[in-house]
């Protein structure tokens, strides 16, 4: 059916449908994935609770943890949310996820392009000075945050150019900033579909790559005539210099700290093994607080089907590589 529809509809079936209303991930089977792992318990002793038959019930177990290099962030649960960026489905469901993270005492991550995609955002000299959408997201979490957890604001190439980290730290009081290499689980696929010419032109003015070019009279006429019905906004891929990647990242982290960011995170996608090694080394030498390694299979779940299915290293295999790299660094006495 998918092949048949593609033959008839072409680009219309590149993405999971209906676009913006559903999330989807890769449906490709691998020899090993997380569904093959089961939790192994024991009747001898206990971890996280006293080994007492009258006390060892699962609601009583302490599963709290912490993240951070120097100043630790307390977390009442050992997991946190994925990054929820500028997609419509992320915007619609932000409140429930942010409230849940605040109550649970964990991290919630604002993904890329939120300010750039905010229709009501205000810019001065190419820098964001007001973003009601980012402000809304931060305030919702802070209303429900107690003594644990934190809100993280992620930035990519466009966000950096628009001054999103500065705005988040200085104007909204955000304490944790996440640098992003590429497009997370999709590596290079940072697309959003745009249904109107006005929206396409607005985002091009804000510095995004928009295809087809909405300023071209030929494309404008073709769009109005119905030759195509949507534009695509693309995010740029963050390029890392092969020889100077560590120095580049250390400088970037120092710049974020000088802004007042208390905690720094790096998010890298499911690139080839050498790139994961670069990310691990950068994280170690810059002594950041958190490294997020995003496996293949889909991010928010609105990427092209082929990107989610055919690109990157599956998560289990990627985590095995990560464990290997960290173990090797630990043996050398490096910062982990």
Task: Enumerate the predicted regions with their spans.
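Flavin-dependent oxidoreductase catalytic cores
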Residues: 75-78, 92, 97, 106-107, ...
């Amino acid at each position: 059916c998918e092949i048949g529809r593609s033959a008839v509809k072409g680009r219309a079936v590149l993405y999971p449908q209906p676009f913006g209303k559903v999330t989807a991930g890769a449906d490709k089977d691998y020899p090993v994935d997380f569904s093959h792992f089961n939790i192994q318990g024991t009747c001898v002793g206990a971890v996280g609770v006293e080994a007492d038959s009258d006390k060892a019930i699962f609601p009583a177990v302490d599963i709290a943890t912490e993240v951070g290099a120097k100043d630790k962030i307390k977390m009442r649960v050992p997991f946190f949310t994925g990054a929820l960026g500028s997609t419509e489905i992320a915007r619609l469901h932000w409140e429930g996820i942010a409230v849940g993270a605040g109550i649970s005492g964990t991290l919630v991550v604002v993904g890329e392009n939120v300010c750039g995609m905010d229709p009501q955002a205000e810019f001065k000299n190419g820098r964001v000075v007001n973003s009601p959408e980012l402000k809304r997201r931060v305030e919702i979490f802070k209303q429900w945050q107690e003594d644990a957890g934190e809100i993280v604001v992620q930035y990519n190439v466009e966000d950096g150019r628009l001054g999103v980290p500065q705005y988040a730290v200085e104007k909204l009081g955000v304490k944790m900033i996440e640098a992003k290499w590429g497009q997370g689980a999709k590596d290079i696929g940072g697309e959003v579909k745009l249904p109107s010419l006005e929206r396409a032109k607005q985002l091009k003015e804000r510095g995004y790559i928009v295809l087809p070019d909405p300023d071209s009279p030929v494309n404008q006429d073709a769009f109005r005539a119905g030759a195509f019905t949507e534009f695509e906004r693309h995010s740029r891929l963050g390029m890392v210099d092969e020889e100077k990647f560590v120095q580049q990242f250390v400088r970037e982290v120092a710049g974020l700290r000088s802004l007042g960011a208390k905690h720094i995170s790096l998010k890298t996608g499911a690139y080839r093994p050498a790139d994961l090694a670069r990310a691990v080394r950068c994280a170690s030498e810059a002594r950041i607080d958190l490294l997020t390694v995003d496996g293949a299979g889909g991010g928010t779940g609105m990427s092209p089907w082929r990107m989610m299915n055919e690109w990157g290293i599956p998560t289990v295999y990627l985590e095995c590589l990560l464990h290997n790299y960290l173990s090797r660094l630990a043996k050398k006495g490096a910062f982990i």
